[in-house]
C-alpha cells in the first residue's frame, strides 16, 4: 500500500472547494431538482439488498470528486494487496486475510509462499465434525448426558462477533442454549453459571494465546465451578474446548488438544467470527447455515474486489462517510437496525470501526491533521426513536445515520412489521425533508386553531431537515444476507483506512491500559496506602482500599 496523505492530493483540495459550494444546499433542493435522484443514488446487491444513498448531501459531482480521492490514494492497489495476501498490517508484519476464511471459490491465497486455503478448509471440516457430534447428542458429558448449553468465554472479537451473529440468526437456532461471557467482572460468569448444569454444559475458551487476562480468569473460574461437581480433572476434556493456537497451555488447562481449533496471525480479532472463533455460531445454527454466512460474505468480497468504484457499495458508503467526517465536521455515525434480532449489530461495528480506524498516527508514523475514524453508536428501532432521535432531528450535531431493515420478518405477528417499517420509512423522510414553519402553521389552521395565538410554540415544532441518511433494505435477514451485510461494513472500514492513510488492522491503543492494570494489580493485594501514581489515581486506589476493608 502507498502512504499518501489525503489532504495533500488535488482531489482533497477540489473537495474542499466543492464543500464550500455544497454546504448550504439542502437535500430537499437536490430532490426537487432531480426527479430521478433515487435511481441515480441507489443500488442493489444480488437482489437481496437495496442500498439507498439518495438522502445525502451529495451530487454526482460530489461522488466523482470522492472517487478521484480514492484513485489518488491508490485504493484499487490496496484492495489488490489485501486480497493477494500481502502483509498490509505493517506494524505487526501480518497479512490481513479474513477474506480467506470465507473464500468459497477456494482459489489459492498465498502468504509467505504458501496457499492458506488447505488449512482453512481443514479447520472448517474439523469444526463441522465436532459441532455435529455436539448437536446430535452423540457427544456425552461426564455423566453420559448430552450437551444442552454452550458457554462461549472470550472478549472483544472473540465475543462481540459470535454474540451478534447468534442473536441475529436466532430464527435459525437449534435446541442448544447459547451463553456468552466476556467481562472480567465476576458478576458476568457468576450469573451465567447460575443458569447451567455442569453435567450438560460445554465451555468454549476463545483466546488465541490462551493468556488473555479476562478470558483466562473466567475460564479458570468456570473450570473450578465445574470440578466442584465433576471432581476428577479428566472430565474437563469432555466439557471444555479451545479456540486457540497455544497447544501447550490448552493441554495444561485440561483440554484435549484434539478439541483445539486453530486460527492464524492473519486473522484480526474483530474480523474473526469467520474463523474458529465462529464455533459458537455453528453450534447455535448448524454448520450449513454457517457456510451460508461465509458464502454471503464471499459474495460481497467478490463485489468489493471486482466492481468498479462508481458502483461499489462498500466504497460508496466509505466515501460518503469521509465527506461528512472531514468536510462537514460530523464526528459520529449512528447504525439503526429496524430488527430486534440485530440488536447487537451497532455494538459489533462500534468495535469494528473504532478499534480499526480510531487512530491519530498515519502510516508514515506522523500525527494526522484531519479526521480519521468516527464515533459509532446506535440501537434498534423503534426504541431509539423514544431515546435519542430527538437530538438527531433537532439537535446541533450532524449525525449521519444508517437505517437497516428487512422487508420480510421472521415473526409476522398481526401488523407489527408494517408498523415497524412505516417508522423506518418515515424517519429517513423526516430527517431529510423536515417540517417548515409554514406547514406547522397550516396544521394549526386545519385544526381550526389560530397560529398567531400559538406563536409561542410554533418554533419548537419546526424541523430543519437536511439530516443525511443511508437506507439499507434487505429482502430478509438470512445467514447469507447477514454475511453480505457484515462484509459490506468491514470493507467500508478498510476503504476509509486506506484513503485516510492509517493502519486499520492493528490496535495499539488497547495496550497501555493493560500494562498499567498489570502494574496496579499487585498494589491492590494489601491494605498499604499507595503513593506511586498521580494524586488522582493514588486517591482512587486508597479510597477503594479503605472501603473494601
Swiss-Prot record:
The active site is at residues 355, 386, 514. GO terms for molecular function: carbohydrate derivative binding; glucose-6-phosphate isomerase activity; monosaccharide binding. It is found in: Cytoplasm. Pathway: Carbohydrate biosynthesis; gluconeogenesis; Carbohydrate degradation; glycolysis; D-glyceraldehyde 3-phosphate and glycerone phosphate from D-glucose: step 2/4. Its EC number is 5.3.1.9. Keywords: Cytoplasm, Gluconeogenesis, Glycolysis, Isomerase. It comes from the Bacteria. Signal peptide: none annotated. The keyword Manganese does not apply. It catalyses: alpha-D-glucose 6-phosphate = beta-D-fructose 6-phosphate. One of its GO terms (biological process) is glycolytic process. The keyword Isomerase applies. Its main location: cytoplasm. It is an enzyme of class 5 (isomerase). It holds the Pfam family PGI. GO terms for cellular component: cytosol. Belongs to the GPI family. Catalyzes the reversible isomerization of glucose-6-phosphate to fructose-6-phosphate. This is Glucose-6-phosphate isomerase.
